[in-house]
C-alpha cells in the first residue's frame, strides 16, 4: 500500500497495478494455508503445542478458518490501501465492525444455533468478509484513487513491495509468537 501511494504521488502509470498485484499474491500465498487447513489441521495444532484433546477439539475449527485464508489476507490488504488512500476512518470502521461481528456471531452460532466450535470457526472465518465489504465503501467513493487494474503477478514486484512491509511483518509475527508462548 505504501508503494502504491509513492507511485501514485509520482503520477506513475504503474500505481494502479499495486492493489490487484497484492490481491493476486495474497491468493497465491493463501493456497498453502488452505492446503494445510484441509489436509494437515491436526499436525498444525500439534506443532503449535496442542495435546490430543486440543487437536480433536480444534481440528474442524482450524480446517474451516484456514480455508478462509484469502479473505484474512485480502482484509489486511484492503485495510492498508484504504488507510493509505486517505480514509483511515473507513479502515478503522472495517477493523472494528469485523471484530464485533466475530464476537457477536461467535455467541449466536455457538449457542442459540448450537454449532459449537464449527460455529465459532464460521464467525471467525466470515469476519474479514465484513471488513472487506466496509472497505468497499471507500473503493466506490469519489475520494478513492485505487483502481483494480489487472496485472500479471511479478515476483520482482512482490519483493519490491515487501521491502517496505518487513517491519510490520516482524511486528505481526512477534505478536503471534507471544500469543502462542
Language-model features: locations:
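Small-residue-rich hydrophobic transmembrane alpha-helices
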Residues: 1-34, 72-91, 180
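Helix-loop interface residues and adjacent transmembrane-helix termini in multi-pass membrane transporters
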Residues: 8-9, 84-85, 111-114, 118, ...
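Residue-level signature of transmembrane alpha-helical cores of multipass secondary-active transporters
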Residues: 26, 65, 91, 95, ...
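Short membrane-interface helical motifs at transmembrane helix boundaries
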Residues: 32-63
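Helix-terminus/linker motif at the lipid-water interface of multi-pass membrane proteins
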Residues: 45-52, 108-115, 176-181
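Cytoplasmic helix-loop-helix junction between adjacent transmembrane helices
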Residues: 50-58, 62, 69-96
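Membrane-interface helix-loop junctions in multi-pass transport and translocation proteins
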Residues: 89, 99-132
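Interhelical loop/hinge segments that connect adjacent transmembrane helices in multipass membrane
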Residues: 124, 135-176
Amino acid at each position: 500500500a505504501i508503494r502504491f501511494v509513492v507511485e501514485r504521488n509520482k503520477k506513475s502509470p504503474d500505481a494502479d497495478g499495486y492493489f490487484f498485484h497484492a490481491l493476486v499474491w495474497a491468493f497465491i500465498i493463501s493456497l498453502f494455508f488452505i492446503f494445510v487447513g484441509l489436509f494437515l489441521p491436526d499436525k498444525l495444532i500439534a506443532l503449535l503445542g496442542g495435546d490430543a484433546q486440543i487437536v480433536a477439539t480444534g481440528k474442524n475449527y482450524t480446517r474451516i478458518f484456514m480455508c478462509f485464508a484469502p479473505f484474512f489476507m485480502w482484509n489486511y490488504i484492503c485495510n492498508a490501501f484504504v488507510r493509505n488512500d486517505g480514509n483511515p476512518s473507513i479502515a478503522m470502521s472495517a477493523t472494528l465492525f469485523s471484530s464485533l461481528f466475530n464476537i457477536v456471531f461467535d455467541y449466536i452460532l455457538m449457542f442459540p444455533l448450537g454449532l459449537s466450535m464449527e460455529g465459532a470457526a464460521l464467525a471467525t472465518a466470515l469476519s474479514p468478509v465484513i471488513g472487506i465489504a466496509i472497505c468497499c465503501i471507500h473503493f466506490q467513493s469519489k475520494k478513492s484513487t485505487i483502481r483494480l487494474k489487472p496485472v500479471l503477478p511479478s515476483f520482482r514486484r512482490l519483493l519490491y513491495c515487501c521491502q517496505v512491509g518487513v517491519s510490520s511483518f516482524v511486528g505481526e509475527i512477534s505478536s503471534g509468537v507471544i500469543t502462542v508462548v
